[in-house]
Amino acid sequence: MNYLFKNGRYMNEEGKIVATDLLVQDGKIAKVAENITADNAEVIDVNGKLIAPGLVDVHVHLREPGGEHKETIETGTLAAAKGGFTTICAMPNTRPVPDCREHMEDLQNRIKEKAHVNVLPYGAITVRQAGSEMTDFETLKELGAFAFTDDGVGVQDASMMLAAMKRAAKLNMAVVAHCEENTLINKGCVHEGKFSEKHGLNGIPSVCESVHIARDILLAEAADCHYHVCHVSTKGSVRVIRDAKRAGIKVTAEVTPHHLVLCEDDIPSADPNFKMNPPLRGKEDHAALIEGLLDGTIDMIATDHAPHTAEEKAQGIERAPFGITGFETAFPLLYTNLVKKGIITLEQLIQFLTEKPADTFGLEAGRLKEGRTADITIIDLEQEEEIDPTTFLSKGKNTPFVGWKCQGWPVMTIVGGKIAWQKESALV
């Protein structure tokens, strides 16, 4: 099916929002211009809505295989499509871990069979993410590994991390890191700050993250490796990354929507839906994340979509697992709380969710260019809705944003020229 989207707006190559039509033919973007006509295409009048590149998320958890009670590739990618994401990068904390040929081939077969959007799987740095034996990077790359990470487990052994970075550099691949120094975690469940003190909870200090990033940056410099930092959350981490970039070290970084919108002062009670890792930090940390995003220290926004069951989250803040679901709320949360409040522009938000992650990792995604694969999301910037987890397509309903009123909701997502998801009656 060919589609002609009429009367839309998009961000052009100069970074300006302008009026446009867009023609999709044979799965590709055939033309982006005003006043397009086509005889062999279904015409869809988007009536002034935003035509954006499909969103790109380099940090997601799909849970399959091994955690299908939390999420599946099918439900997770449907939720991604509903959130406007067309390319997502799946973390390897599955069971089994994609750490060898057999496990990666199985994962890729599942993705091919079940995914509604483009899914790029990470390969693990170490076997079973155990930190003691390096995986076969060459084989994992051959089988389509996006990059290498041990995800929710920081690689504690510096010699292992250095060896991994050297091998990744030879393959022109990135090493991606969840940064925690295990000896400083302190069995914490929230940030070490006012909230932990008030509620008598063990806290995770900010330096637990930043000291690990500092170590890895020096290792990356020694290995001449592209090193990407997951979900930056502290002022100290931003400072260390900024200094590294000024020194010419190949470091990039991401921040989550929840760390841009919330800080520890916003946690109303010991509610496990506010428990994520890294935890919500202090006001100064929150301000540093915004500053880092605006000055280029932080390169992109990634959701860290981490679904859990209601039963798991009901165990209380100390025992419940870390993480919140993120696909279906990311764009409206950011548009409402950053763009509408004048903190960043719409153009910047689009870049942080599309071309910045795509360019950082060399993906042919993130831009509406003629000849490229038609990965597109249509967004209604005017429609206001309340966040209601009962409407989520994700199995995970674990969100701290219940009842938040937001604008900027995706209404249609196109992947490879085919409609992957459409809001009922939105464009008829």
UniProtKB/Swiss-Prot annotation:
A GO cellular component annotation in the UniProt record:
cytoplasm
Q: Which PROSITE patterns match?
A: DIHYDROOROTASE_1 (PS00482), DIHYDROOROTASE_2 (PS00483)
The biological pathway it contributes to is:
Pyrimidine metabolism; UMP biosynthesis via de novo pathway; (S)-dihydroorotate from bicarbonate: step 3/3
Q: Which family does it belong to?
A: Belongs to the metallo-dependent hydrolases superfamily. DHOase family. Class I DHOase subfamily.
InterPro entries (UniProt xref): Amidohydro-rel, DHOase, DHOase/Allantoinase_Hydrolase, Dihydroorotase_CS, Metal-dep_hydrolase_composite, Metal_Hydrolase
Q: Name any cofactors this protein relies on.
A: Zn(2+)
Q: How is the cofactor bound?
A: Binds 2 Zn(2+) ions per subunit.
Q: What is its EC number?
A: 3.5.2.3
Q: Which residues bind substrate?
A: H61, L62, R63, N93, N277, H308, F322, G323
| Gene3D superfamilies listed in its UniProt record | Metal-dependent hydrolases, Urease, subunit C, domain 1
Spell out the reaction equation it catalyses: (S)-dihydroorotate + H2O = N-carbamoyl-L-aspartate + H(+)
Describe its function: Catalyzes the reversible cyclization of carbamoyl aspartate to dihydroorotate.
The record's GO molecular-function terms, alphabetically, read: allantoinase activity; dihydroorotase activity; zinc ion binding
Q: At which positions is Zn(2+) 2 bound?
A: D151, H178, H231
Would you say which domain of life the source belongs to? Bacteria
Q: Which GO terms describe its biological process?
A: 'de novo' UMP biosynthetic process; purine nucleobase catabolic process
Q: Which PANTHER family match?
A: ALLANTOINASE
**UniProt cross-references to NCBIfam families, sorted A to Z:** PRK09357.1-2 (NF006837), pyrC_multi (TIGR00857)
Q: Which Pfam families match?
A: Amidohydro_1 (PF01979)
Q: What is this protein called?
A: Dihydroorotase
Record key words, sorted: Hydrolase, Metal-binding, Pyrimidine biosynthesis, Zinc
Taxonomic classification, please? Bacteria, Bacillati, Bacillota, Bacilli, Bacillales
Q: Does the keyword Zinc apply?
A: yes
Positions contributing to Zn(2+) 1 binding: H59, H61, D151, D304
Species of origin reads: Bacillus thuringiensis subsp. konkukian (strain 97-27)
